[in-house]
Each structure stands twice: as C-alpha cells, then as structure tokens.
C-alpha cells in the first residue's frame, strides 16, 4: 500500500516511465496483430480497414495496453479498460491473460479469455470461444493456473469451450 503523497508520486512516475519505455514493443505487437487480421481474413480490403473497423483488433489493442498496466500493478484501470472493450465489442479479454504475437480474433462476439490464460503466437479465435476456468470445488477458491494454455499456431473454432488449466 502507498503510505504518503511522495510515495504515490514516485510510484506513479515509475509506472509512467515503464509504460512509455514499453510503447515501442506494444506498437510492434499491435502491428503483428494487424498483419494477422489482414492475412487471416480474405474479406479484408486493407490494413487500414482492419485498424479502423475490426472489433477483434480493437479488443486486442485495449488488451495490450491494459495488460501492460496490469503487469505494472496498476489497480482497477486495466480492468475498467477491458470491461469497456467488452461492452463495445462483446469480446472479454482479462488484462491478466498472456497473449503472444500475431493474434487474430475473427467475428469475435462472445469470446472470453480468462485471467490466467496463456495464448501462444499465431493463434486464431472465432466467435463464441471460451478459454475459462472450472468452478471451484466444494466452495474452495481455486488458486494458481485456472485457465487453459493454447500453444503456438492454433485455431479454435466457433463455440468451443476450453476450461481449466490444461494445455491444448
């Protein structure tokens, strides 16, 4: 916890510095996501179309920024960002998830990506996919890895539900 105003200023400055230093890497990841969307959708007319009109890419963009803030232990704001994107797109990506490069969401309504999900590189998700947790057993909270791991070069098609901490 932060004890005084000076400590708050120091923490805020450190988070801002870290975030600003990470912007080139975030941009590089997003450009690979744009390429994945453009390359993966034969209906895409241009990368500009993908950037300005694809809800899946919007959700990925918000996730990438929110995830960076989450990794910096910024409270509440990453979750607010992800919920805003969820409301705008129907795509729910928890900012704690770990998502590799060249990520493509096609027709993304109803996608859920849980907090401890790990997604490799070159992964494609279609509408209605859930990468979720199992319910707690006998009222006990589940700790640790609760969501699936998806390896590289995977495609998960419409309506699939993958639950628990296993690898696919």
Residue ranges and their predicted role:
Residues 1-83:
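Terminal amphipathic alpha-helical/low-complexity segments used for targeting or macromolecular assembly
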Residues 86-168:
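Structural signal for interior beta-strand "rungs" in well-ordered beta-sheet cores
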């Amino acid at each position: 916890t932060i004890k005084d105003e000076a400590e708050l200023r120091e923490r805020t400055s450190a988070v801002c510095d870290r975030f600003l230093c990470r912007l080139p890497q975030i941009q590089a990841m997003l450009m690979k996501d744009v390429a994945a969307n453009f390359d993966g959708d034969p209906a895409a007319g241009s990368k500009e179309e993908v950037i300005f009109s694809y809800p899946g890419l919007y959700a990925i963009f918000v996730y990438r920024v929110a995830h960076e803030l989450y990794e910096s232990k910024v409270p509440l704001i990453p979750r607010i960002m992800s919920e805003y994107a969820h409301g705008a797109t129907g795509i729910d990506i928890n900012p704690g998830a770990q998502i590799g490069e060249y990520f493509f969401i096609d027709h993304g309504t109803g996608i859920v990506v849980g907090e401890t999900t790990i997604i490799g590189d070159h992964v494609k998700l279609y509408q209605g996919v859930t990468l979720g947790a199992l319910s707690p057993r006998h009222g006990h909270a589940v700790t640790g890895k609760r969501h699936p791991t998806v390896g590289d070069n995977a495609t998960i098609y419409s309506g699939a539900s993958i639950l628990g901490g296993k690898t696919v």
